[in-house]
Amino acid sequence: FPVQIFKVKEGVNFNPGDPNYDLFQLALKTSAQRLFPNFSFIDAPFNLQYYRPGDYNTEVAYMGCRTRVMGNVYDPTKEVTCGRGNLSFTSINLPRLGIEAHGDIDKFFKSLDDMIDLVIRQLMHRFKIQCSKVVRNYPFLMGQGIWIDSEKLNINDQVGEVLKNGTLSVGFIGLAETLVALTGKHH
């Protein structure tokens, strides 16, 4: 950290002839050697549905851990990047599940389903604890109006209504190693 996010957009830097195509090529070369920067493809179908030309708030954002912040289940009218963030994340250790499955794909997916359920319960528990905190527990984020609607709160108000605009993430690690554990080879 800090992590650099390189935004890619047709007409800006994606295609040969775009004004900043050379910068995109340099970013690709750098990423091939250093694994950074990360890339945000604004025109990808799952991002483009939120994008409104000229409104940077509607350009999808990624956190340092590559968590995508855009969709808002709580309030779809606030599907923007500014004033929001990822509240908590948990990564599932896929190789462990693969090793424990001893090559049994059905057992692996059953274990994965169970683990996802556990992680969701864990994230919701953590969210409940975070929501019980008050503005003074987050003096910068809430006290300075950084989060959406936090300027409406007083110093001793709970922050739950504001945090509902955030995200909770389930991630995974070790996909290639999991394939080796289950099938003997990876991609």
Sequence positions of predicted segments:
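Conserved catalytic cores of very large enzyme subunits
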Residues: 1-165, 185-187
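Contiguous, well-ordered alpha-helical segments that form the cores/surfaces of helical PPI scaffolds
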Residues: 168-181
